[in-house]
C-alpha cells in the first residue's frame, strides 16, 4: 500500500535538474560524459557561469574563515541559499537590491542550485572535489573594490593548482547525488503533505510553501534536500527530514518506522 502511494505521489511531482534519474529506484547518472582532462582554470570558468559572476578565484581552505571574518567586519552578511528551521529560501535578490552586501555560502547546497552573483550577491563561495584544499570564490561583475582586493589577497593562481586525477568523477558524482536528494525531497514533501499525522510541511518546492515563489525565481534545478514538518500531536515542534539519493520508497519506509 505504501509503495503504491509513493508511486502515485512521485508520478505527480515534476523534477528539475541536470541529472537523468529514476528517483523511485534510487538511480541517477550525470548528463553527458565526465571531462577528466579539466584544468583548474576550467573549474574556475565553470563557476563563473554557474553563479553568474564576473570572475572567480581559488582561495586555500586555511584562509577562508579569515576572509569571511574580514568581510563581515566590513559590513557583509554571510548567507546560505537555504537556511533556517523551518527551511526557507534566502531572498538574495531582494536583500541585495535593498543595499545589503551579501556573501553567499554555497558549500552545502552546491553552486549549481543558486546563481547567487547573478541575483546580486557580492561573492559566492563554493567547494569542488576537483580542487581539494581550495574553495572557489566568485565575484560579482563590478565587484566592490575593497571586497575584490580582500579576495585577491588570499587567492592563488589557478595555473598553479592541479586538478586531482579522481576529482572530476567525484564532483560529478556529488552533483548527481545532490540533485537526486533534491528530487527525492520533493516526493517526500508531497507525501508528508498528505500524511494524516502531519499538520504542517515546509518545503520550498511545494506550491503551498511561503518560499515557493522565491524558490522558483531564485533557485536552479531543484529545491534542496530539507523537508521540515510538525506532527499534529506535537504542535509547534519542528522536525527535519534530510533526503538522500537512495530509493525514495526506502526513505519513506524508514521514516515511517522511525516516526
Language-model features, listed with the residues they occupy:
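Conserved small-domain helix->loop->beta segment predominantly found in fold-type I
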Residues: 170, 178, 186-247
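Conserved PLP-enzyme active-site core in the AAT-like
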Residues: 1-196, 202, 208, 258
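PLP-dependent enzyme catalytic core of the Aspartate aminotransferase-like
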Residues: 1-8, 58, 232-259
Amino acid at each position: 500500500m505504501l509503495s503504491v502511494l509513493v508511486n502515485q505521489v512521485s508520478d505527480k511531482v515534476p523534477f528539475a535538474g541536470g541529472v537523468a534519474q529514476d528517483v523511485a529506484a534510487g538511480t541517477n547518472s550525470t548528463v553527458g560524459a565526465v571531462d577528466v582532462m579539466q584544468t583548474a582554470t576550467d573549474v574556475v570558468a565553470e563557476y563563473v557561469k554557474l553563479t553568474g559572476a564576473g570572475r572567480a578565484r581559488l582561495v586555500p581552505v586555511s584562509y577562508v574563515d579569515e576572509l569571511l571574518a574580514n568581510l563581515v567586519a566590513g559590513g557583509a552578511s554571510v548567507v546560505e541559499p537555504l537556511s533556517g528551521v523551518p527551511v526557507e529560501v534566502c531572498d538574495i535578490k531582494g536583500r541585495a537590491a535593498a543595499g545589503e552586501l551579501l556573501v553567499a555560502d554555497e558549500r552545502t547546497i552546491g553552486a549549481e542550485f543558486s546563481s547567487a552573483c547573478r541575483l546580486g550577491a557580492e561573492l559566492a563561495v563554493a567547494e569542488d572535489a576537483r580542487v581539494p584544499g581550495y574553495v572557489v570564490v566568485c565575484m560579482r561583475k563590478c565587484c566592490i573594490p575593497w571586497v575584490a582586493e580582500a579576495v585577491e589577497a588570499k587567492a592563488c593562481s589557478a595555473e598553479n593548482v592541479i586538478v586531482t586525477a579522481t576529482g572530476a568523477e567525484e564532483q560529478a558524482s556529488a552533483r548527481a547525488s545532490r540533485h537526486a536528494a533534491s528530487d527525492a525531497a520533493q516526493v517526500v514533501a508531497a507525501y508528508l503533505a498528505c500524511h494524516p499525522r502531519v499538520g504542517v510541511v515546509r518545503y520550498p518546492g511545494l506550491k503551498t510553501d511561503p518560499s515557493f515563489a522565491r524558490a522558483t525565481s531564485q533557485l536552479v534545478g531543484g529545491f534542496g534536500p530539507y523537508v521540515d514538518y510538525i506532527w499534529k500531536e506535537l504542535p509547534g515542534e519542528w522536525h527535519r527530514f534530510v533526503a538522500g539519493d537512495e530509493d525514495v520508497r526506502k526513505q519513506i519506509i524508514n521514516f515511517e518506522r522511525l516516526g
